[in-house]
Amino acid sequence: MKEMIIWPTYIDSKRTKNEGRKVSKEFAVQSPKLKDIADKINKMGLEYSIENKKSYPREPWEICGYIKVKIEKNASKLQILKEVCKSMK
């Protein structure tokens, strides 16, 4: 197993790729909330933990938190993000 970090910015449709969005606009969701992302990860059956009081490195003034997810070694991080986005739409 390996861990991946999911910042809300990674799937936010309001962000550009330069601002940290990792998925394409077609998959991205508008203003994703940490709790909503956690709910989707839980429904996917993955282990996770939430870190609420952390700020995204490119925006240290904004406390948004992140989710640490345990995934299989051969799992694609981008595919996990896309699955989360699909279930949020």
Curated annotation (Swiss-Prot):
The keyword Calcium does not apply. SUPFAM superfamilies: SRP19. It is found in: Cytoplasm. GO terms for molecular function: 7S RNA binding. InterPro entries: Signal_recog_particle_SRP19 (IPR002778), SRP19-like_sf (IPR036521), SRP19_arc-type (IPR022938). Its main location: cytoplasm. GO terms for biological process: SRP-dependent cotranslational protein targeting to membrane, signal sequence recognition. Part of the signal recognition particle protein translocation system, which is composed of SRP and FtsY. Archaeal SRP consists of a 7S RNA molecule of 300 nucleotides and two protein subunits: SRP54 and SRP19. Involved in targeting and insertion of nascent membrane proteins into the cytoplasmic membrane. Binds directly to 7S RNA and mediates binding of the 54 kDa subunit of the SRP. Belongs to the SRP19 family. This is Signal recognition particle 19 kDa protein. It comes from Methanococcus maripaludis (strain C6 / ATCC BAA-1332).
